[in-house]
Amino acid sequence: MAKKVEAYIKLQVAAGKANPSPPVGPALGQKGVNIMEFCKAFNAQTQGMEPGSPVPVVISVYSDRSFTFTMKTPPASFLLKKAAGLKSGSARPNTQKVGKVTRAQLEEIATIKMADLTAGDMDAAVRTIAGSARAMGLETEGV
């Protein structure tokens, strides 16, 4: 018989930097999950990623307190800020533009995010990422 899923926990943890302190410890501790086991497994899987990049993770906690987790790609906003060389987006995105991204950069980000997007093809994915860029106050060239 398959194990019964008790809960899903959604977290965003920096790659290679999972530790028992908040937000990881309290979220997993409430469900009775072995915190250090998760931290070691997560850090091992994110070893090849850029250290410190935020990685969304969905943890499935089973009735016997075991767990599995799936990692998603970093948020589009993080990738866009990195591509544009910014620390943060615009406070007033419709009036105050803070940077530019090219179509080539948008295609690169869309390629990374394709697994998590519901877009049917690459062009739709690029338009989705371009919309995120405009919402952050970035100008999009060639879209």
Swiss-Prot record:
The keyword Lipid biosynthesis does not apply. One or more lysine residues are methylated. One of its GO terms (biological process) is translation. GO terms for molecular function: large ribosomal subunit rRNA binding; structural constituent of ribosome. Gene3D superfamilies: Ribosomal protein L11, C-terminal domain, Ribosomal protein L11/L12, N-terminal domain. It comes from the Bacteria. GO terms for cellular component: cytosolic large ribosomal subunit. Keywords: Methylation, Ribonucleoprotein, Ribosomal protein, RNA-binding, rRNA-binding. Belongs to the universal ribosomal protein uL11 family. Part of the ribosomal stalk of the 50S ribosomal subunit. Interacts with L10 and the large rRNA to form the base of the stalk. L10 forms an elongated spine to which L12 dimers bind in a sequential fashion forming a multimeric L10(L12)X complex. Forms part of the ribosomal stalk which helps the ribosome interact with GTP-bound translation factors. This is Large ribosomal subunit protein uL11. The gene is rplK.
